[in-house]
Swiss-Prot record:
It comes from Acidobacterium capsulatum (strain ATCC 51196 / DSM 11244 / BCRC 80197 / JCM 7670 / NBRC 15755 / NCIMB 13165 / 161). Pathway: Porphyrin-containing compound metabolism; protoheme biosynthesis; protoheme from protoporphyrin-IX: step 1/1. It holds the Pfam family Ferrochelatase. NCBIfam families: hemH (TIGR00109). Its EC number is 4.98.1.1. The lineage of its organism: Bacteria, Pseudomonadati, Acidobacteriota, Terriglobia, Terriglobales. The gene is hemH. Fe cation binds at H172, E267. This is Ferrochelatase. It catalyses: heme b + 2 H(+) = protoporphyrin IX + Fe(2+). Its main location: cytoplasm. PANTHER family: FERROCHELATASE, FERROCHELATASE, MITOCHONDRIAL.
Length: 325
């Protein structure tokens, strides 16, 4: 059989219309009941921004990566079409024998990378060799891509203000239970205990790497955004609490830079551009956001390097053992 390689990009997914939001949310929470008021709020946000461009932008990122690599690039979504299972099935039908899967959530977490990984391997089985990129929060080209966007907003804003302008880095919050270290089960003492989830640490490491690439940055802070509207507690500090604290310290101008998202979608276009901006304005603060990475050449370069590295590892794992001398 002829060996054929490809790349698989994995993302969260978004519905195509407001009418599909209830079904989409059922996928997000694995079929658990969702309060009607939560469904209505999500629908409101979706409509307010004119629909989410996440799928279209992710497909564009795939096309750019395909041009850079000269290899087929597929895109699969966990919570909406094109579903990961359907895309992996198509890859097998297309004769793909090995692939590198890259989760477009750079910071590793059991709620992102772990779920995507299970979805890919559940369908691929033994039909295709998969190399999975576990997390790339500290990738130098990723940091350079964010820094490039940040610089383009922060420098002119600082010149306009005529004084210091701090930066607030953000990443999507996750449930507290996700990142808490599991405790040994006294009823099953031999059951292995998973290590703490790395997400909290990795999100802040990304921010640190981005900040280091922007010369003269006045100060920077970190918060978790877009906490869930139902369920138990989610990790913080929240953006709202952080904005309030910074206002009390006398800060009136701020750049907010999300570092966990690679393209525009609801959490940027609504949560940041509408909700957080209105919240800041009510405090008497001016908030600006850099452009999202979307079609950033540096992001394409980062993905290409990750993909090639993954392909090289797959190739090496297939290489025969050297003959004994």
């Amino acid at each position: 059989m002829e060996e054929r390689a490809a790349i698989l990009l994995l993302a969260h997914g978004t519905p195509d219309s407001a009418e599909e939001i209830p079904e989409y949310l059922r996928n997000v929470v694995s079929g658990r009941p969702m309060p009607a008021e939560v469904i209505e709020e999500v629908r409101h946000r979706f409509v307010e921004i004119g629909g989410s461009p996440l799928t279209a932008l992710t497909l564009q990122q795939g096309r750019l990566l395909q041009e850079a690599l000269g290899l087929p690039v597929y895109v699969g979504m966990r919570n909406w079409k094109p579903y990961i299972a359907d895309v992996v099935k198509q890859m097998v039908e297309d004769g793909i024998t090995r692939a590198v899967a890259i989760c477009l959530a750079p910071q590793n977490s059991r709620t992102s990378v772990g779920l995507y990984r299970r979805a890919v391997f559940a369908e691929a089985g033994q039909k295709m060799q998969i190399g999975f990129i576990e997390g790339w929060a500290e990738d130098d080209l990723l940091a350079a891509a964010f820094a490039d966007r940040l610089r383009a907003t922060w420098e002119p804003f600082r010149a306009e203000v005529g004084g210091p302008v701090p930066v607030l880095f953000t990443a999507h919050s996750v449930p507290c239970r996700t990142v808490q270290a599991p405790q040994p089960d006294p009823e099953a003492p031999r059951r292995p205990v998973l290590p703490p989830d790395p997400y909290n640490y990795e999100a802040k490491k990304t921010a640190m790497h981005v900040a280091a690439k922007v010369d003269g940055l006045d100060a920077w802070y970190f918060a978790f955004q877009s906490q869930g509207m139902s369920g138990g507690p989610w990790i913080g500090p929240t953006v709202e609490d952080t904005l309030t604290a910074l206002h009390q310290e006398g800060i009136r101008h701020l750049v907010i830079q999300p570092v966990g998202f690679l393209c525009d979608h609801v959490e940027i276009l609504y949560d940041i551009d509408i909700a957080f901006r209105d919240f800041a304005q009510n405090l008497g603060m001016m908030l600006r956001r850099p452009a999202s990475l979307n079609d950033s050449p540096l992001l394409t370069a980062a993905l290409a390097r990750l993909a090639q590295s993954g392909l090289d590892r797959l190739q090496a794992s297939e290489a025969p053992e050297p003959a004994a001398s």
